[in-house]
UniProtKB/Swiss-Prot annotation:
Gene name of this polypeptide: rpsB
Originating organism: Francisella philomiragia subsp. philomiragia (strain ATCC 25017 / CCUG 19701 / FSC 153 / O#319-036)
Pfam families the UniProt entry points to: Ribosomal_S2
GO molecular function, a single term: structural constituent of ribosome
The protein's name in its UniProt record: Small ribosomal subunit protein uS2
PROSITE patterns xref list: RIBOSOMAL_S2_1
Gene Ontology CC terms: cytosolic small ribosomal subunit
Similarity annotation: Belongs to the universal ribosomal protein uS2 family.
InterPro entries hit by this protein: Ribosomal_uS2, Ribosomal_uS2_bac/mit/plastid, Ribosomal_uS2_CS, Ribosomal_uS2_flav_dom_sf
Highest taxon listed in the record's lineage: Bacteria
Keywords associated with the record: Ribonucleoprotein, Ribosomal protein
GO biological process, alphabetically ordered: translation
Amino acid sequence: MSLMKEMLSAGVHFGHKKAFWNPQMKEYIFGINHGVHIINLEKTVPLFQDAVNFVGKTVANGGKVLFVGTKRQAQDIIEAEAKRCGMPFVSHRWLGGMLTNYKTVRQSIKRLAQLEKMKEDGTFESLTKKEMLQNIRTIEKLEKVLGGIKEMGGLPDAIVVIDSNKEHIAIQEAQKLGIKVVSIVDTNSNPEGIDYIIPGNDDAVKSISFYMKKFADAVIDAQGLDRAVEAKAEETTEA
């Protein structure tokens, strides 16, 4: 099946009602059907391919890509696909400063690791019931917000975003730090300042699944390429 047909099947072409449109998306809109903007997939296909290739190259070069999608219908997909390809993710809430104040965030990640170790090695058993419950609640709270980035080990090289409106703070932080931004941009969104714009439906579960599966597949392929290059380098060194 061609990429265009896959996109049509996933409903990528369905935008928002005309009343909610952002005029800056005009060049990516094909027309209107029953008051809803239809996205021009002839524009989306090459832009999406460019974005997927960029993500693959970033990972092949040893980079990290952070998947971001905190809206309800994106949460499970973001988490599942990020875990499938071994990339960091944020699927519940974007903490202000998650990138721009990463040093502080890293301290919270360390705290989470310490508490998890205490829970595993039996240290919790020597605490009072109240202290134990407080620590368990802290673990749950930190895990929900930071669980997806606790293995990130530093700032990412790029972020992949579902819904540029909802994740505008994440995008602003990435832009400040010169981190490349790949984003699905619906007809009600502002494409300005996004490095890799993907005009498309950012609400339908089927569309979100389509995007994230393609990105995760690209990461997995790139990881295989990266490992092959490493193995070849090792062979050369040994020789």
